[in-house]
Amino acid sequence: MVSTILGAFRVADIRKKILFTAAILALYRLGTHIPAPGISASAVKAVSQQLSGNGIFGLLNLFSGGGLGRIAIFALGIMPYIRASIILQLLQVVVPSLEKLQKEGEVGQARITQYTRYLTVGLAFAQSIGYVFLFKSFQAQAGVTLIPNFTLAKVFLIVISLTAGTVLLMWMGELITQRGIGNGISLLIFASIVARIPNGVHAWWTNPDQVFRVIMPFIAVGVVAAIVFVQEGQRRIPIQYAKRVIGRRMTQGTQTYLPLRVNMAGVIPVIFAASVMAIPPTIGQLIGQNRNNFGTDLANFFSPQGWHYVLGESILIILFTYFYTAVTFNPVDQADNLKKYGGFIPGVRPGRPTAEFLDRILARLTFPGALFLAAIAALPTVLINQTSANFFFGGTSILIVIGVALDTMKQLEAQLMMRNYEGFLK
């Protein structure tokens, strides 16, 4: 891996892409320290310290890279864009017009991307309104005035600022994808989580439980190794191509394979589950600010440290893993493409039998992959409960960090291989 990075810096255009990506990420981290207008800067620190052990606050703050804790212009993070992308992907299955756009290639994808941007703005605006009242609810808990002169004009100013911050992040992510290395949106989430690692290390080192301090590094290494193993694991289906006549030449039949990953859905189900499970406690927090017992009970019931949250998140991860795998990989289309180009699976007839065969294999692979995602997402939460650690750094974060790191290294490797440089995969 080190040789890959060093080799990349020796190539001028790749070096420019890496530096451009690093510059955008640095600007993002800078934005998480710029407070939103209309917020009392002196009260922000008191609120952040008071609510450091609040489960929902810690979860939301993690994905904003600490921006929520500082109530910065990037307090929403990139999550509205993630939710909008997931919603559009779900709608492509049930809305015929969107499904048609998906099959129109680059032109259709550009239209879907534009719809995603519009939906992102709407979701960010709605979430900004909710966050303003969430900030107001924090005032009573922290005993400070976070938003002086709570007027309609002040609320509108904060909402517009937070929405604009999300739109700016969306643009920065697209810039990284177009002109940098890796997927821009994923790297922004990656940067948000990595920025919280020092706090996590400090929480581990200062934990009074000596046993926890000793075994935690071994657990972390084991979890990372397991994630890499499953993320890279695949079932290779042999594909045989018959002899074909191209022009006046007879081409020999070739043999290759179709890789089916154990975790075809990647980290999308985990992100989706985390974003959905954050809604009930947030609503409970908003309702409970007026001393409403139902709101308080709802927030406590779905607290990220509670078993109700772990169970609900695990169920959502398993269900959405199956659904997203079905969306991203269509056995019928794959079988038709193989038949069209003269390919077949040895021992399986082309056409419908091939589609049924691929569907069975995919179902067998998806089940353990979904269970693995749910287990990894739940394990750190269980450890936090057992050790009374107050830093929220769950399995969702670990999965995202490792997944994005692997994908980025693969893209960097591909850039090097295009230029005939020796890379990481030897």
Roles of regions detected by a PLM:
Residues 1-102, 107-426:
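N-terminal cationic and glycine-rich segments that engage phosphates or anionic surfaces
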